[in-house]
Amino acid sequence: LYGIFQAKNAIRKEDFCFLVEGYTDVISLHQAGIENAVASSGTALTEDQIKLIRRFTENVTVLFDGDAAGIRAALRGIDLILKGGLNVRVLLLPDGEDPDSYSRKHSTNTLTDYFKKNAKDFISFKIDLYAAE
């Protein structure tokens, strides 16, 4: 789980963590002042990674790319996180953006405002997704 050592105090303080896809996403978010982010390091999320997150919080916001691959990864992650007994929210970025590119373009305040306004509980996320199909 990439970045957990650097993020653990912020995760405890904020009582949630952002789960992103890759290490560049974690680095860019940390540089933008969003320090409670970790990555599954480009691999599929594992039960052991979820147990590690659970040591610091029971709340996870899945922050993946807004493209089709990001949505598929978010769906896989949601089910595994729920199975691990954690609370899940989902935040998709605009199409063509990932946490790395988005955090480079926007200030910390803009990022946190966007994240707060657009994070959805997993049920709303799935309903919106299936309604769009």
Model-derived features: positions:
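Conserved nucleotide-binding/hydrolysis micro-motifs of P-loop NTPases
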Residues: 24-25, 43-45, 67-69, 94-98
